[in-house]
From Swiss-Prot:
Family of the protein in this entry: Belongs to the class-II aminoacyl-tRNA synthetase family. ProS type 1 subfamily.
NCBIfam families (alphabetical): PRK09194.1 (NF006625), proS_fam_II (TIGR00409)
Name this protein carries in UniProt: Proline--tRNA ligase
Enzyme class, UniProt record, top EC level: ligase
Catalytic reaction equation(s): tRNA(Pro) + L-proline + ATP = L-prolyl-tRNA(Pro) + AMP + diphosphate
């Protein structure tokens, strides 16, 4: 490819509304252009990288035995109504009516459609296992699309769905997809972690996220440097930081804390460690009658140490909270505690509440907590002596850096990550809802055991840039760069020798299967270099009259601090050996 044939449209500055590095650089590099909130044109430079990501995914999915198909972007409501998700999906699913007043939606995902395929086409256990995948446009009407392609409304996704005759066989399909995803992200050249993830309302214990490591990532990834343990912050188990409860050594005292309503302020006022305080969080659950009217509300008091944070996902797994909870209203808090938030605690309640203590809180002694009176806290509080034991002790907090690893092999560390892939064991959730069955070996109908496996194709571009960039621009891994090599001839229109050597190098690289672009725009060297550093091409070769007189060209890798001189005769073998080892 020659630059004059291609479409190069770089910007010196990013638009003012660009928020994150990847969004700014993709716009400046001429990869994307915004059409509407969360919707982008992918220009030729960006599409080249997308196609390379898709090709790697396609090769590894095929290698794993998955079969490619395409399902419609526009899907009828009837299938979604079978699973109940037509109403549950909320406004994120864009719905519309056709000219016949029939309801349709733009697909945010395709479990219903693929399950319909299976129930129509897979009649016998002899046809199993099967794994279908597509690389297709999705649309989710995000409330606040942001961060460019990282959280767009229209995006490209690879979604795969496995169908098996047993849970054991489904586990094998899951493992095969996990291995395929690992190969995909290895080939993409990204630093990533596969972490255990929460399974949400579906249940089960098979779910992993593939997270690209980046300081700007939205997700917290917990791992142990001394073992293979890794989980996202929602799932990572928090052990008690106190092996056992010490005996009481201080009397209970109602202590004035005027205007100090946070654990940090109370600890500073009293001159005690923040880890000696207890934080109170009040939740409520509602019982409804058949008409949906609330007939009873139950108030819950959850206690975590003052330097810890409540993990709402873990709280949602507690019996009684599984069906859903909310934070209590101020009226409910006044009714049960007799005071406003900021001074709440488990001692001297106005009305009974269910008390759940985090594992660490349950082992605390002589702790500080709210006194259920404005401007007062208790000091020297102890379980059993000053207040009843909690109704339940559970892991309800987020882990923090330095916590003991649940596998007992060291301490936990935390990184930031960007989720780009997810593998999930579904079980029979969809096959039962849609009565999708096959005839098993005994001749009886049986529901398919399913798994689903997603990769955000366009999101990978943003994640790769967030991980790989500098002040000059993008630093693409070679496997997904729009071009692997750029040849920059200095004096293209003026020197026949430069044109000849540039063309010879170009021809040699093309013959070796290298994706190379020859910059024949006749720009000044500084302009060419700035463009290609911004775009992020991994390898640059500069050919000029001065170097040719000495028989050398200038080579610079995108990550190299300085250029090096390489003999003209050696430059093609040098590049080919690096790119096609």
């Amino acid at each position: 490819m020659r630059a004059r044939q291609f479409f190069i449209s770089t910007l010196k500055e990013a638009p003012a509304d660009a928020e994150v590095v990847s969004q700014k650089l993709m716009l400046r590099a001429g990869m994307i252009r915004k059409v509407a909130a969360g919707i982008y044109n992918y220009l030729p430079m960006g599409l080249k990288s997308i196609r390379k990501v898709e090709n790697i995914i396609r090769e590894e999915m095929n290698r794993a035995g998955a079969l490619e198909l395409t399902m419609p972007l526009v899907q009828p409501s009837e299938l979604w109504q079978e699973t109940g998700r037509w109403d549950k999906m909320g406004p994120e699913m864009l719905r519309f009516k056709d000219r016949h007043e029939r309801d349709f939606a733009l697909q945010p995902t395709s479990e219903e459609v693929v399950t319909d395929i299976a129930r129509q086409e897979l009649k016998s256990y002899r046809q199993l296992p099967k794994n279908f995948y597509q690389i297709q446009t999705k649309f989710r009407d995000e409330r606040r699309p942001r961060f460019g392609v990282m959280r767009g409304r229209e995006f490209t996704m690879k979604d795969a769905y496995s169908f098996d005759r047993s849970a054991e066989a489904a586990g094998e399909s899951y493992d095969a997809m996990y291995a395929a995803y690992s190969r995909i992200f290895d080939r993409l050249g990204l630093t990533y972690r596969a972490v255990a993830a929460d399974t949400g309302a579906i249940g089960g214990d098979r779910s992993h996220e593939f997270q690209v490591i980046a300081d700007t990532g939205e997700d917290a990834i917990v791992y142990c440097p001394d073992s293979s343990y890794a989980a996202n912050i929602e799932l990572a188990e928090a052990l008690s930081l106190l092996p056992a409860r010490a005996g009481a050594s201080a009397p209970l005292a109602k202590t004035p804390t005027p205007g100090k309503s946070t654990c940090e302020d109370v600890a500073a006022l009293l001159g005690v460690p923040l880890a000696s305080t207890v934080k109170s969080l009040v939740l409520a659950t509602d019982d409804e009658d058949e008409s949906g009217k609330v007939v009873k509300s139950t108030v819950w008091l959850l206690l975590v140490r003052g330097d810890h944070e409540l993990n709402e996902v873990k709280a949602g797994k507690i019996e009684g909270l599984k069906a859903g909870f909310r934070f209590a209203t101020e009226a409910e808090i006044l009714d049960h505690f007799g005071c406003k938030p900021g001074y709440l605690g488990p001692i001297g309640l106005a009305q009974p509440v269910k008390v759940i203590a985090d594992r660490t809180v349950a082992n605390m002694a002589d702790f500080v907590c709210g006194a259920n009176a404005e401007d007062f806290h208790y000091t020297g509080a102890n379980w059993g002596r000053d207040l009843p034991e909690p109704d339940l002790v559970a892991d309800i907090r987020n882990v923090v850096e330095g916590d003991p690893s649940p596998d007992g092999k060291g301490k936990l560390a935390i990184q930031r990550g960007i989720e780009v892939g997810h593998v999930f064991y579904l079980g029979t959730k969809y096959s039962k809802a849609m009565n999708a069955t096959f005839l098993d070996v005994d001749g009886k109908p049986k529901h398919f055991e399913m798994g689903c496996y997603g990769i955000g194709v366009t999101r990978i571009l943003g994640a790769a840039i967030e991980q790989n960039h500098d002040e000059r621009g993008i630093i693409w891994p070679a496997s997904i760069a729009p071009f692997e090599v750029v040849i920059c001839p200095v004096g293209w229109s003026k020197s026949e020798a430069v044109r000849d050597e540039a063309q010879k190098l170009y021809d040699a690289l093309v013959a070796a299967g290298v994706d190379v672009i020859l910059d024949d725009r006749d720009e000044r060297p500084g302009v060419m270099f700035a463009d290609w550093e911004l775009i992020g091409v991994p390898h640059r070769v500069t050919i000029g009259d001065r170097g040719l007189k000495e028989g050398v060209a200038e080579y610079q890798g995108r990550r190299d601090p300085e250029a090096s001189r390489v003999a003209v005769a050696e430059i093609a073998p040098h590049l080919i050996s690096r790119l096609r080892p």
